[in-house]
A protein has these predicted regions:
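Compositionally biased terminal segments of proteins
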Residues: 2-219
């Protein structure tokens, strides 16, 4: 068993693909993400969390307007069941009425079936919201199939896409925010990363690892 102690509150069991994270308190972003993930876990839906929230989850000091979830495609009735369960837990559907079966089905046909993302809000909050989409590309399926399990405070379970893919993908857009996220994750998990895997994704996405050092020197 290979376990890396990343920091005082993070341990990474590489062999099991599991990260143990202890947080003194959960942020609003955390609570919303955990509740949404709990619903997916309960229904057995395969998913991963991608993009900015992953860095925030591990302590990057910034806020995000959205939390990105990507799942295996859902059948229409599965999506209906999912939405009704989310409704009971306080979520709202931006593109439709989460309390109406016909509205949920219209959103499914008009958005998810056509490859568009949809958004959910929680309670009276506008931000952060959940951006929800279903996998379409091999890269998206890879992120789900090889997701890591993060166990937060020994009670919450959330799946994230592989760190190597997250870092490479964050370098691809080249925005300051994305570069900052990539530097944060790379610096934090450097000892535990599969560097061969990281270089594979850097090559696939045609980005240079030196961008991490350049971006890091700015911060």
């Amino acid at each position: 068993m290979t376990v890396f102690v990343i920091s005082d509150n993070i341990a990474f069991d590489v062999d099991r693909g599991t990260i143990f994270l202890e947080k003194s308190s959960l942020s609003e972003d955390d609570r919303i993400a955990m509740l949404f993930a709990e619903t997916l876990n309960e229904l057995g839906v395969r998913y991963s969390v991608i993009a900015g929230y992953v860095a925030i989850l591990f302590g990057r000091a910034r806020r995000s307007d959205d939390i990105d979830f990507i799942t295996y495609p859902l059948a229409e009735d599965e999506f209906l069941k999912f939405c009704l369960l989310l409704r009971d837990r306080g979520f709202k559907l931006v593109q439709g009425d989460i309390g109406s079966e016909s509205s949920i089905r219209k959103v499914y046909e008009g958005y998810l079936e056509r490859g568009f993302s949809i958004r959910f809000t929680y309670g009276d909050l506008i931000l952060p919201n959940i951006e929800f989409k279903t996998a379409r590309s091999p890269l998206q399926y890879y992120g789900i199939d090889n997701s890591l399990t993060v166990i937060v405070n020994k009670e919450h379970l959330i799946k994230i896409a592989p760190l190597e893919l997250q870092i490479a993908y964050k370098l691809y857009p080249e925005s300051e925010k994305d570069l900052g996220d990539a530097v944060f994750l790379y610096t934090l998990f450097r000892q535990a990363l599969n560097h061969q895997e990281l270089h594979k994704w850097l090559s696939t996405l045609r980005v240079d690892i030196s961008m991490l050092e350049v971006a890091g020197s700015r911060g």
